């Protein structure tokens, strides 16, 4: 049997500063394969030095073998994946949210599995995404996270499916070009192991 649910989760967090109030037009700042352009996303250039306990809406998937936690408020990343048989995490579980200013728009965190598109470490990697739980006819459950990306007006989704009797998490990426012109993109996931 597979269960999915939403639960409040308190995680020690170093909060981010306020976004720059004026847009930053970065051009020709080649940054790990991207142009560096992030407009219209706001850029954040500061992180607090003090840790606070912050409450997040965490979404969980669980069967007899594994338990997974997804944080839609932090870009829809898989924050935790736990092997219940071996009693250990099978991806790095960073139990403190401490951003570094290395992302295209500033904040980026290590750990879990991060999903990136249309370029680099997704400009919105530290921003909230939409979330939905889908119960499938075969007894599996899928948690979908999605967003309408602002730079190129594409829609990106990641579906996390857990099946009864299986000891793996199935991840499906879906991208939609919502424009009338062809768009280029990169798509990849960064699992921390």
PLM features: residue spans?
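Extended, loop-rich substrate-binding clefts of extracytoplasmic carbohydrate-active enzymes
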Residues: 25-53, 58-62, 110-168
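Acidic-aromatic substrate-binding/catalytic surfaces of carbohydrate-active enzymes
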Residues: 2-38, 58-62, 66-128
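Intrinsically disordered, low-complexity regions enriched in Ser/Pro/Gly/Gln/His and often acidic
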Residues: 101, 110, 137, 180-181
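Acidic, contiguous internal or C-terminal segments within carbohydrate-active enzymes
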Residues: 48, 62, 68, 72-86, ...
